[in-house]
Each structure stands twice: as C-alpha cells, then as structure tokens.
Curated annotation (Swiss-Prot):
Gene3D superfamilies: 6.10.160.10, Ribosomal protein L20 (1.10.1900.20). GO terms for cellular component: chloroplast; ribonucleoprotein complex; ribosome. It is found in: Plastid, Chloroplast. It comes from the Eukaryota. Belongs to the bacterial ribosomal protein bL20 family. It comes from Fagopyrum esculentum subsp. ancestrale. GO terms for biological process: ribosomal large subunit assembly; translation. Pfam families: Ribosomal_L20. SUPFAM superfamilies: Ribosomal protein L20. Binds directly to 23S ribosomal RNA and is necessary for the in vitro assembly process of the 50S ribosomal subunit. It is not involved in the protein synthesizing functions of that subunit. The keyword Amino-acid biosynthesis does not apply. This is Large ribosomal subunit protein bL20c. The gene is rpl20. Keywords: Chloroplast, Plastid, Ribonucleoprotein, Ribosomal protein, RNA-binding, rRNA-binding.
C-alpha cells in the first residue's frame, strides 16, 4: 500500500490550532498533541467561567448592597434580605446591579430609598412608588 501525503488539509488544521494556542507558554504551544489537548482545556475553561462570572458579579453586588444598608447613620440594623423583601413589597423595580452602583456612587440615594421603605408601615394604604 502506498503512502498518502496529507498535505494541505492537515497543515491547515494544525495551523488553525497553532494560531489559537500561539500565546500559551512553553511546550503548550509547540507539539501538536499537546496543542490539541490545551485547546480543548482552554475552551472548556472559557465556557465554565462565563457562567461563573455571572455568579461572582451577583455575589459582589449583594455584598456591596449589604454593606451600604448596614452603614446607617442611626445605627439601626437592617439586613440585605429584609431590604430586598421590602423592595418587592413596595413594587420597586431595581435590580441588584443598579442598587450596587447607587450604593457606591451615591450613598444618599440608597439612604433615601431605605428611609422611604422604613417610613411606610402599611403597604396597602400607600401603593405609590418612589
């Protein structure tokens, strides 16, 4: 049986793989077997970490909101979970990202939201929004 020269197609496939891993360190960008393994590993990690990034940012926003809520002038203890529960009761449509940005950039605004929530005792008598 005669030998088949792979030629253009195999070269193109390997070149494409090498371009992907060209910035990898050491032998991770040289031998084609290791290159193939590292490419699979990199794509797997990228896919996993796209979801992880969403979780991490949500945790960060919750931590920032909680820190801002607990730093009140009067020293009244108010937790994040109560704050979010009361926001939903008052039908305030503010997501955690926006609340975290308000907490960092403009503390007075988060205090005013906080005070409005605490002021109204009976939610059914006062359905107006901020």
């Amino acid at each position: 049986m005669t030998r088949v020269r792979r030629g253009y197609i195999a070269r193109r496939r390997r070149k494409k793989m090498r371009l992907f891993v060209s910035s990898f360190r050491g032998a991770h960008s040289k031998p084609i077997r290791i290159v193939a393994q590292q490419k699979i590993r990199a794509l797997f990690s990228a896919h996993r970490d796209r979801d992880k990034k969403k979780r991490d940012f949500r945790r960060l926003w919750i931590t920032r909101i909680n820190a801002a809520i607990r730093e009140t002038e009067k020293g009244i203890y108010y937790s994040y979970s109560k704050f979010i529960h009361d926001l939903y009761k008052r039908q305030l449509i503010l997501n955690r990202k926006i609340l975290a940005q308000i907490a960092i950039l403009n503390r007075n605004s988060i205090y005013s939201i906080y005070n409005e929530i605490l002021k109204k005792e009976d939610w059914k008598d006062a359905p107006e929004m901020l």
